[in-house]
A protein has these predicted regions:
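Conserved mid-core segment of classical short-chain dehydrogenase/reductases
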Residues: 98-113, 239
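Rossmann-fold cofactor-recognition segment
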Residues: 55-74
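Conserved glycine-rich Rossmann-like NAD(P)H-binding loop of the short-chain dehydrogenase/reductase
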Residues: 35-50
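A glycine-rich helix->loop->beta "capping" turn
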Residues: 59-62, 81-95, 101-102, 218-219
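Catalytic loop of short-chain dehydrogenase/reductase
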Residues: 107, 113-127, 138-176, 191-194
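C-terminal helical subdomain
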Residues: 172, 179-244
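Flexible N-terminal pre-Rossmann segment of NAD(P)-dependent oxidoreductases
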Residues: 1-16, 240-244
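N-terminal Rossmann NAD(P)H-binding glycine-rich loop of SDR-like oxidoreductase domains
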Residues: 20, 28
C-alpha cells in the first residue's frame, strides 16, 4: 500500500539537467506536483516544445524550460549564474543525466566510445556539480541519479559501470568536502519502468524519493530504490533521519 508522502516545495527552485529524458520526466512531474519551480535545460526549442507537450497539463507556470548547453564547464557555469540572477537563487539540483550503452568488451571499445560513454558524461556531471553546489541553499540538496551498474560489472557495457562508479565517488567526495554546509546524495536505481522500458521501479517512485531528499533535512548519503516498497521505505527513512 502506498502511504501519503506529499511534500510542499512551494517556491523551491530545482534545476533538473537531463529532465527531458525518460527518468527525468518522472522527476520533473514529481517536483511540479510538490509545487516547486522546476528549471529544465534542453538542447533546442523543438525539444522544449516536445517535452511540454509530453507533460500535458502537468506543464504549468512552475515549469521553466531553458535552451542551454550545460555539457561543458563554461556552459554549466553560465546556466547556473543565469538561474541565480533571474530566480534569486537555487535550492536543489537533481541530475538524471545519461543513458545506456552497449558496445562490446573493454578490449574492443574505440576512442569515440570512450569519449561518448565515459568522458563526456562524467564531464557533464562534474560541470553541473562544480557550478551549482556552491550556490545551493542550505535547505536544498544535490542529487545524482545512477543505476545498479555503478556497483556491479556489466560485461559488454563496462563503460557504463565505470562512469556510474565514478559518479558514486563524486558524490562521496562532494559530501565529504561539503560537511554540513551542503547535502549531497546518490539515488541508486534498479531497472526503471518508463515510457521507454519496463522495470521494477517506476519513474514516479524515483521522482517521489528525489522530492523527499530535497524536502527533508536528512544528511548526505546514498539511497537505493528498486521497487515501490523500497521507495516508500526510503521516504520514511529520510523523514526519520531529518528528525534525528
Amino acid at each position: 500500500m502506498t502511504t501519503v508522502t506529499t511534500f510542499d516545495l512551494t517556491g523551491h527552485r530545482v534545476l533538473i539537467p537531463g529532465g527531458t529524458g525518460a527518468v527525468g520526466e518522472g522527476v520533473v512531474r514529481a517536483f511540479l506536483t510538490a509545487g516547486a519551480e522546476v528549471i529544465v535545460p534542453t538542447r533546442s526549442e523543438g525539444r522544449s516544445t516536445e517535452f511540454r507537450s509530453l507533460l500535458g497539463d502537468a506543464a504549468d507556470e512552475h515549469l521553466h524550460l531553458i535552451v542551454h548547453d550545460y555539457t561543458t564547464f563554461a556552459g554549466a557555469k553560465d546556466l547556473v549564474e543565469q538561474i541565480v540572477r533571474f530566480r534569486g537563487g537555487l535550492d536543489s539540483v537533481v541530475a538524471p543525466i545519461g543513458g545506456w550503452w552497449q558496445g562490446g568488451l573493454l578490449t574492443e571499445i574505440s576512442e569515440d566510445d570512450w569519449a561518448s560513454a565515459f568522458t563526456e558524461l562524467a564531464t557533464t556531471h562534474l560541470a553541473i556539480l562544480r557550478a551549482a553546489l556552491p550556490h545551493l541553499a542550505a535547505k536544498g540538496a544535490y542529487t545524482v541519479i545512477v543505476g545498479d551498474s555503478a556497483t556491479r560489472p556489466v560485461p559488454g557495457s563496462g563503460l557504463v559501470s565505470m562512469e556510474q562508479a565514478a559518479l558514486l565517488m563524486m558524490q562521496r567526495v562532494a559530501a565529504a568536502e561539503s560537511g554540513e554546509s551542503r547535502r549531497v546524495f546518490t539515488l541508486v536505481l534498479g531497472q526503471v519502468t518508463s515510457r521507454l522500458a519496463e522495470g521494477t521501479v517506476t519513474v514516479g517512485d524515483v521522482g517521489r524519493v528525489a522530492v523527499a531528499i530535497s524536502g527533508t533535512t536528512a544528511p548526505s548519503g546514498s539511497v537505493g530504490v528498486h521497487d515501490a516498497g523500497e521507495a516508500e521505505s526510503a521516504i520514511a527513512a529520510l523523514r526519520e533521519a531529518a528528525r534525528a
